[in-house]
């Protein structure tokens, strides 16, 4: 029966705004929300905490299977992520965590270990899933698919403003370099490379406001 539950996938590179758009769309539709990136980041945190050697595939896969990840919504609507019962939300948002998550996500055995866990989020009345391979690998039969993109320079600017607003001092050039490096890893990896599904709606958000992107995505589902 899970196959009958409607799914909207929103894929795209790092820093493109998938999470922001997906959360708004899920709330408007009244559907569940899967942040697949948070799941990979949670495993990355567990790997770091356990000092697992990233070259030890067997240990990484065991960590992916064993790590307990829970998403808890606070009264203010903010989502907190618990890794093995410890609130790791702030750690998940660190740039170093993102880099480690991208590294382990390139390992086929790790992706296989997390595939079923992601598919279990498919529940009535529907699911909005954001990530990099939601429409191509995890939910290839999804009724609605979006591939969101933006120029690397624009994504770096957005991330720079986010971090500065939080009081985190960063160099714009370093952020841009990191985004380009992550794009290269995601696109060139042999397993589930970042690419739009053949039947995905392509949206370039470089010169768009969030509400404009949300409107296009909602139109895909409701029209």
UniProtKB/Swiss-Prot annotation:
<dbReference type="GO" id="GO:0005737">
    <property type="term" value="C:cytoplasm"/>
</dbReference>
<dbReference type="Pfam" id="PF02224">
    <property type="entry name" value="Cytidylate_kin"/>
</dbReference>
<protein>
    <recommendedName>
        <fullName>Cytidylate kinase</fullName>
        <ecNumber>2.7.4.25</ecNumber>
    </recommendedName>
</protein>
<dbReference type="GO" id="GO:0036431">
    <property type="term" value="F:dCMP kinase activity"/>
</dbReference>
<dbReference type="GO" id="GO:0006220">
    <property type="term" value="P:pyrimidine nucleotide metabolic process"/>
</dbReference>
<keyword id="KW-0547">Nucleotide-binding</keyword>
<keyword id="KW-0808">Transferase</keyword>
<dbReference type="GO" id="GO:0005524">
    <property type="term" value="F:ATP binding"/>
</dbReference>
<feature type="binding site">
    <location>
        <begin position="12"/>
        <end position="20"/>
    </location>
    <ligand>
        <name>ATP</name>
    </ligand>
</feature>
<dbReference type="InterPro" id="IPR027417">
    <property type="entry name" value="P-loop_NTPase"/>
</dbReference>
<dbReference type="GO" id="GO:0036430">
    <property type="term" value="F:CMP kinase activity"/>
</dbReference>
<dbReference type="InterPro" id="IPR011994">
    <property type="entry name" value="Cytidylate_kinase_dom"/>
</dbReference>
<keyword id="KW-0067">ATP-binding</keyword>
<keyword id="KW-0963">Cytoplasm</keyword>
<keyword id="KW-0418">Kinase</keyword>
<dbReference type="InterPro" id="IPR003136">
    <property type="entry name" value="Cytidylate_kin"/>
</dbReference>
<comment type="similarity">
    <text>Belongs to the cytidylate kinase family. Type 1 subfamily.</text>
</comment>
